[in-house]
A protein has these predicted regions:
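Sequence/structural signature of beta-propeller modules
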Residues: 7, 14-150, 534-546
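Blade-loop segments of beta-propeller domains
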Residues: 145-172, 183-273
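Structural signature of eukaryotic scaffold interfaces centered on beta-propeller domains
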Residues: 152-176, 267-278, 366-386, 444-445, ...
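Structural motif
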Residues: 189-218, 290-296, 396-411, 466-477, ...
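Short loop/turn segments immediately following beta-strands, especially the blade-tip
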Residues: 221-225, 295-333, 402-428, 474-483, ...
Length: 546
């Protein structure tokens, strides 16, 4: 047991498998609507960033005049970017909730977490065949997940960041771990519903633990040991018994009024298509809302003695349980984390202030004006540190834009996170993506899954269903007198299922700059699909584009 953490009188540690007593059963219910912030969260489309979503019958908002007909010629000219549309503001202040949770549970630093990484990966040639990669780019590093993560239908990897984003010198803690962090979203659940008679449907003996909407987990990879560890992201709240608790990340509670089934999804998760680790903060893209922010100094440890079969005492006099995979937060005076040892609570929300455009987004349609989508984010350290944020769009289904990108000074974002409710962070630049070029009988410049900006040039990862994606390059220029991104006519074949981008600049460790990404598709999705992390030498990428 962790020294110094002694249970209160009458709260002795118990075997992890012991069921809650009838006395405890009336206390601390399953999380519900009481956990949501006053201003709520908007839902994203179920098929967010899915190349196959939509029917091709999208419609535009009345406020936009551009054509919405599907097809290559629908967007003949780039749309201008409007930086004002990207403005963010700090939402409901939850610092008091985080303080209460901080006092209730023990914590673990990231350096120690890296030393206790428990899941082995494969590295370089041990990953086997490299069939998911195209012929244009030489892959420099490869990392393969443990088999259950490589094949999981529940968890789908999306976003990537690392220590090069976190610190200029790339030196985190006392180890040589040089952590890389990958976020994945829960793709397999109906979740629960407050409005159904069987609100506790996911707790039934017959229910799989995959029933719950677990939200987002982050996997921290130790490059020195090739081991990694999962951390579940959570949302702090006061439950109906006025006790501090936490729930998995989601947008809103569903409103199924009958039995909760897969066709009546109870909860709406978030996609986490992009992530930036900057200093102590982890920024996670929330497509419909903006960004969720987490603090790496607040990683809570539900199993500090590393003995899963024994409940550990917590500073608040209760115990924690990492065996039960169906429960989350404080329930019946026991702390749970869906079986995960580590949970990290959200500390702030940065929400878009601009109203949504009125057009449909069910098929990943995008629009030239109004609130953007936070589909992916990355960090540019070339000059003054900036976050780059962009949209995934599918013009085959309509809309009036192939996507927009904007940049924020990191100093403004940090000030908003640490400031009072309403503190804003404004984009200082915005562009619409290039148009005109074609690929596979459709527009080239859409279906963007990741972006990075490096030494003045922009690099985009374009997906292509269950086939090789493309790495694209664009340069700021002038088109018809307006400042816009001009696409390079050359494209580079990338991996199957390409996702977010992360640039490890190498200024601290002396290595050549690496452009990292990841593939999302499990082998069950297609014959050649495979999940890997991989990097290209950035110098070779630049040279290959000419």
């Amino acid at each position: 047991m962790l020294s110094g953490l002694v249970p209160a009188v009458g709260a002795a540690a118990a075997p992890a498998s012991a069921p809650p007593s009838s006395v405890r059963a009336a206390d601390d219910p399953a999380p519900g609507n009481e956990g949501m912030p006053d201003d709520g969260f908007d839902n994203e489309s179920e098929g967010e960033q899915d190349d196959f979503a939509g029917t091709g019958t999208g419609s535009a908002a009345a406020s936009d005049s551009a054509s919405t007909a599907p097809g290559v010629s629908a967007l003949a000219a780039p749309v201008p970017g409007r930086a004002a549309d990207f403005k963010l503001a700090k939402s409901t202040d939850i610092s008091g909730l985080v303080t209460k949770l901080d006092a209730a549970l023990p914590k673990q630093g990231l350096t120690e977490l890296m030393e206790q990484a428990n899941r082995p990966s494969k590295w370089e040639g041990a990953c086997g065949t490299a069939g998911i990669y195209g012929s244009d780019l030489a892959v420099n590093h490869r990392v393969c997940w443990q088999s259950d993560d490589a094949t999981s239908s529940e968890w789908v990897p999306q976003a990537i960041t690392g220590v090069s984003d976190a610190q200029e010198d790339e030196d985190w803690g006392t180890s040589n771990a040089e952590p890389i962090a990958v976020a994945g979203y829960d793709a397999e659940n109906p979740g629960r519903s407050n409005y159904a008679k069987d609100r506790d449907n996911c707790l039934q003996d017959s229910a799989s633990d995959a029933c719950n909407e677990k939200g987002i987990r982050v996997s921290f990879f130790n490059q020195a040991t090739q081991m990694y560890r999962h951390v579940l992201l959570v949302w702090p709240y006061m439950n109906s018994k006025d006790h501090i608790s936490f729930d998995a990340l989601h947008a809103s509670e569903g409103k199924c009024t009958t039995e909760v089934t897969s066709s009546c999804a109870a909860q709406n998760g978030i996609h986490a298509g992009g992530m930036v680790w900057y200093g102590n903060y982890l920024y996670v893209a929330d497509t419909a809302n903006g960004m969720r922010v987490f603090d790496l100094r607040k990683i809570m440890d539900l199993n500090p003695d590393n003995k899963a079969d024994v409940d550990d005492p917590t500073p608040d006099g209760l115990v924690s349980n990492v065996v039960d995979k169906k429960r989350i937060g404080r329930q019946s005076n026991v702390w749970y984390g869906y079986g995960y040892r580590y949970v990290m609570p959200q500390v702030a929300t940065l929400k878009f202030t601009t109203a949504k455009n009125g057009g449909t987004t069910s098929g990943n349609q995008c629009y030239a004006t109004g609130r953007p989508k936070a589909s992916y984010i990355s960090l540019d350290r070339t000059d003054t540190d900036h976050m780059v944020l962009g949209e995934y769009c599918n013009t085959n289904n309509g809309g009036t834009s192939p996507g927009r990108v904007g940049t924020y000074p990191m100093a403004e974002l940090t000030a908003a996170v640490e400031g009072a409710t309403g503190t804003t962070a404004s984009a200082d630049l915005a562009y619409g993506l290039p148009t005109g070029a074609t690929f596979n009988n459709e527009a080239l410049w859409h279906k963007i899954q990741g972006v990075t900006r490096y030494e003045g040039k922009w690099y985009f990862h374009r997906s292509n269903g269950y086939d090789n994606g493309r790495l694209l390059q664009a340069t700021p220029g002038t088109v018809d007198g307006a400042s816009q991104l001009v696409g390079n006519a050359k494209t580079l074949e990338s991996a199957f299922g390409p996702e977010d981008l992360y640039l490890a600049h190498g200024r601290g460790d002396g290595f050549a700059p690496q452009l990292w990404s990841l593939s999302e598709h499990a082998p069950s999705k297609c014959g050649s699909c495979k999940r890997e992390l991989y990097s290209y030498n950035m110098g070779e990428v630049i040279s290959d584009f000419g």
